[in-house]
A protein has these predicted regions:
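OB-fold/S1-family single-stranded nucleic acid-binding modules
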Residues: 501-516
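Beta-strand elements of well-folded, non-transmembrane domains
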Residues: 422-426, 474, 497-499
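Conserved phosphate-handling catalytic cores of large alpha/beta enzymes
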Residues: 109, 118, 123-129, 139-211
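Beta-strand/loop nucleic-acid-binding surfaces
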Residues: 471-487
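Short, ordered beta-strand-loop transition motifs
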Residues: 314-316, 352-354, 457-466, 500-503
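Hydrophobic helix-and-loop "lid/oligomerization" segment in the mid-to-C-terminal part
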Residues: 2-115, 135-137, 185-404, 415, ...
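Long, low-complexity segments enriched in small/aliphatic residues
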Residues: 425-469
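Flexible glycine-rich surface loops and low-complexity tracts that mediate binding to linear polymers
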Residues: 489-504
Length: 516
């Protein structure tokens, strides 16, 4: 890992720290944060309205992650509002895999549905759409994923491929919400309270699917966070989940939701039935249901920790490839992400399930997983994803071991971590500047800070952590280094600023004693 001081090249604002943070995120025009290209005016919105008005028995096919769950809930509440007979289907991760398939379509046929609407999936379901049509169903695809080149032969809504849409980096749930909003706008029957319930779900999904917090994304996430902090949240399911957060400081931020609420939602789709959370978001706000959802997440944590403790890495590998037996495939992405965070190397974690070897890969920005892996001459059973995350499966071990060997031939550039040299009045002043940029998340991140300082007032906590103080700019500031025992001396310190129940402190990311 290389560490370099970040220097701003453009002056966007007068405040030095604010200017550096904006430059760090490649934001050179404040309109990117303040401007909103919304509402959407889809090219084929009239066809959507006609199709919705035409059919009374409608099936929704959603995905099992947070985005798909929220998108399913949005479309379900919309169709119920119109008095439709609506039925939603979310596939099982292990049995069905991602997206639309013949098994899910058969459920819609058995339910006597005449129209299928996909949410957060379907843009690459060419054969599946044909299968549905051959059985007498019409199909509307709503998705935000990129097409492999060919589109399904049906009505499709995807902001990436609609010339009327100026900002397309939105999640699947927001695509669903924008269609619902467009329907009511064209009918001149907008119910603000009802739509607020839906946009809150789309905002939560925007955080979960790590969408850039620009344009309309920034607007809806900011409003969601504001509603939560002012106790004005409309969706009771979201309110109940927020109430279960182990949050000891105020206000709640988008990052808090990302780390505390989103994993709870995703856990049901990873280990059990994502429909639990759809039920929570669409009217079943029982204590028993949320207890079950929380319980599934606790199980997910325990299984993840157990599996992670058994992983043994070959440190000679350029790219880590692990094959674990008897692991729930819903944990693969979490495990590869945990290894990546610790090692900063691209990582794949695989397991054997249903006669297939399935895996999940994660990488930093320095190595494009999708581009590099798709260039390999390997017989994949399935492959898909994007720059930093991919899913792969093999039908036999020979192909897997060929992949494990040949993936080592890639050159992985050394990742670079940029920092801002700390030269500011106080942690309080810095925190106020950071707070002024909320919501913070994808597309608007805070770099690490750096100082070279003597440490003092050292306290060892639980025999493995070190609390200490640093004298900077005529005042002492409190720091903590987790899983590290320190002694007095001069140190190079990389840190991030955290708001804790005990006040602001620097959380150490990297620390090294300066040689005398």
């Amino acid at each position: 890992m290389n560490y370099l001081e970040f220097e701003a090249k453009n002056k966007i604002v007068n405040d030095d720290l604010l200017n550096k943070i904006l430059n760090y995120n490649n934001i050179y025009d404040l309109d990117l944060l303040n401007k909103t290209n919304y509402p959407y005016d889809y090219e084929n919105i009239d066809e959507f309205i006609k199709m919705i008005d035409k059919h009374n028995n409608i099936a929704i096919i959603g995905d099992y992650d947070c985005d798909g769950i929220c998108a399913t809930a949005i479309m379900y509440l919309f169709l119920k509002r119109l008095g439709k007979e609506v039925y939603y289907i979310i596939g099982n991760r292990t049995i069905d895999g991602y997206g639309m398939n013949s098994n899910l379509i058969n459920h819609a046929i058995e339910n006597k549905s005449k129209l299928i609407i996909t949410v957060d999936n379907g843009i690459n379901a060419i054969d599946e759409v044909e299968y549905a049509k051959s059985n007498g169903l019409e199909v509307i695809v709503t998705d935000h994923h990129l097409s492999s080149g060919e589109f399904p032969n049906c009505l499709c809504f995807n902001p990436h491929y609609d010339k009327n849409i100026k900002f397309s980096d939105v999640c699947g749930a927001f695509v669903a919400f924008s269609l619902v909003h467009s329907y009511f706008r064209h009918k001149n029957s907008v119910d603000k309270s009802f739509l607020t319930n839906l946009y809150e779900l789309s905002a939560l999904a925007t955080i979960a699917d790590v969408m850039p917090l620009y344009d309309i994304n920034r607007n809806i996430v900011a409003n969601l966070v504001k509603s939560i902090n002012y106790n004005k949240i409309t969706n009771k399911g979201i309110k109940m989940l927020v109430g279960r957060m182990n949050k000891t400081t105020n206000p709640i931020t988008a990052m808090d939701l990302s780390f505390s609420v989103v994993p709870i939602i995703n856990a049901s789709g990873r280990l059990d039935d994502a429909s639990f959370v759809v039920n929570l978001f669409t009217g079943n706000e029982s204590k028993e249901l949320i207890d079950e959802i929380i319980s599934i997440n606790e199980k997910r944590k325990n299984l993840t920790n157990e599996a992670f403790s058994n992983i043994r890495l070959d440190l000679s590998e350029n790219i880590y490839v692990c094959l674990l037996e008897n692991i729930n495939e819903g944990l693969l992405g979490i495990l590869s992400g945990k290894i990546l965070n610790q090692t900063k190397k691209p990582t794949f974690v695989f397991t054997t399930t249903n006669d297939l070897i399935k895996g999940s890969g994660r990488s930093l920005e320095n190595f494009d997983l999708h581009q590099n892996i798709s260039s390999m001459d390997i017989n994949f059973n399935s492959f898909g994803g994007h720059k930093r995350a991919v899913g792969i499966s093999f039908s036999n071990k020979e192909d897997f071991f060929k992949f494990k060997k040949e993936v080592q031939m890639f050159t992985v550039p050394e990742p670079v971590t940029y920092y801002i040299k700390y030269n500011y009045k106080s942690f309080n002043d810095v925190f106020k500047t950071i707070r002024s940029l909320e919501p913070i998340g994808e597309g608007l991140k805070i770099p690490y800070f750096y100082t070279c300082s003597e440490i003092s007032d050292i306290k060892i906590i639980n025999e493995k952590h070190t609390s200490f103080r640093v004298f900077m700019n005529n005042r002492f500031e409190r720091f903590i280094a987790y899983n590290t025992i320190l002694e007095s001396g001069l140190y190079n310190i990389l840190f991030e600023l955290k708001n804790t129940p005990y006040g602001l402190q620097g959380n150490v990311y990297k620390i090294a004693k300066v040689s005398e």
